């Protein structure tokens, strides 16, 4: 870019994310009145973040001040070389730089990053149940809604909100039941949370398997016990009143059965990651089914990109290009703890990311992302990205 505007100053501060943990906010200043701001949820502990902020102020900022604000790749590559600073500090400065440049040109962030090629919104995977939440009482890490039968972001968000409300009520009723050991055992053995979610979809007036599908992050790595070679299911064990363990073969059968009973279009982390033989066996079982075109084990046709592993916007762009050249789809992961910054929504549009995971619409920080998507839909029209799963 021919325009030259030197970076005047960089300031980074510690803030709080949605979980009350330390996060990072960065400001990049240029010219007399240009300021770009960005915040990134914390991945590191408080001491590491504070040390990273101090290092940015005392060392790295000096290397960046005076650089042309519009040379995003040069700035990002300099940040990427300094791997000793926390990822959240680096990414916050990278995004703040882009925001400042976009502001100077009076462009939206997605348009500045993606130019005229930024035309499609990412299709959504919307959090329905978090395995770490006490009310959910499940062993899977996440259950998500995939509203790929609904053609607009506005419609997808509306559906998710309606389903979420009914699903929360159903969970409260289930958890409030007493003296029903047989029912509890049945709920656990038959994928009770999935059953409740399916019922909530239907009560909200949507069709499972046509408008709404499910994505399952089994989180098998945390269930796997290396020493014994089995998968332990503590939540199911509590509901059944007896220890529940599954071998590789039993877990494959369990997952295969669930994908037959429920409209599951995506399986993430279904088995211990190093068990390639088991994953291939699961893929084969899904391929042998008549509805195999609806099923995918993550990594076969789509790749998850975790923002917590990305240091700069340039790194994200390059990663997207690499995956796309392999002929695979991309899902931009959500962070479990968030800030009120929707920059990654703009980045997803700019770089042509097909799908994006987002938190529950009832979460304030996630709502900021949904509201940004709604505004972008007004500008770009109802043009959704590729449905990876």
Please describe what each predicted stretch is:
Residues 119-183:
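Mobile "lid/hinge" segments at catalytic clefts and subdomain interfaces of large enzymes
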């Amino acid at each position: 870019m021919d325009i030259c505007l030197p970076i005047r100053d960089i300031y980074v501060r510690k803030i709080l994310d949605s979980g009350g943990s330390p996060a990072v906010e960065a400001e990049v200043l240029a010219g007399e009145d240009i300021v770009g701001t960005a915040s990134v949820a914390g991945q590191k502990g408080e001491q590491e973040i504070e040390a990273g902020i101090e290092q940015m102020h005392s060392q790295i900022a000096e290397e960046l001040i005076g650089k042309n604000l519009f040379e995003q790749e040069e700035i990002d590559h300099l940040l990427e070389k300094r791997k000793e600073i926390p990822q959240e500090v680096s990414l916050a400065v990278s995004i703040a730089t882009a925001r400042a440049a976009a502001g100077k040109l009076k462009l939206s962030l997605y348009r500045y990053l993606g130019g005229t090629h930024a035309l499609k919104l990412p299709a959504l995977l919307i959090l329905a149940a978090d395995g770490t939440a006490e009310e959910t009482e499940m062993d899977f890490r996440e259950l998500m809604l995939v509203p790929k039968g609904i053609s607009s972001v506005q419609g997808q968000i509306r559906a998710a909100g309606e389903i979420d409300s009914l699903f929360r009520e159903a969970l409260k009723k289930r958890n409030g039941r007493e003296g029903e050991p047989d029912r509890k055992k049945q709920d656990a053995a038959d994928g009770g949370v999935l059953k409740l979610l399916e019922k909530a979809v239907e009560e909200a007036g949507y069709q499972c398997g046509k408008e709404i599908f499910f994505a399952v992050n089994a989180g098998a790595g945390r269930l796997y016990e290396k020493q014994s070679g089995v998968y332990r299911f503590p939540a199911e064990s509590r509901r059944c009143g007896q220890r529940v363990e599954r071998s590789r073969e039993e877990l494959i059968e369990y997952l295969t059965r669930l994908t037959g009973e429920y409209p599951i279009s995506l399986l993430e982390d279904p088995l211990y990651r190093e068990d390639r033989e088991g994953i291939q066996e699961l893929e084969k079982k899904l391929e042998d089914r008549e509805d195999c075109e609806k099923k995918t084990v993550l990594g076969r046709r789509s790749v998850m990109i975790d923002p917590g592993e990305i240091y700069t916007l340039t790194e994200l762009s390059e990663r997207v290009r690499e995956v796309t050249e392999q002929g695979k789809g991309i899902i931009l992961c959500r962070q479990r703890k968030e800030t009120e910054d929707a920059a990654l929504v703009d980045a997803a549009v700019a770089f042509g990311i097909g799908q994006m995971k987002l938190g529950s619409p009832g979460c304030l920080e996630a709502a900021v992302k949904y509201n940004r998507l709604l505004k972008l839909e007004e500008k770009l029209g109802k043009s959704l990205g590729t449905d990876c799963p």
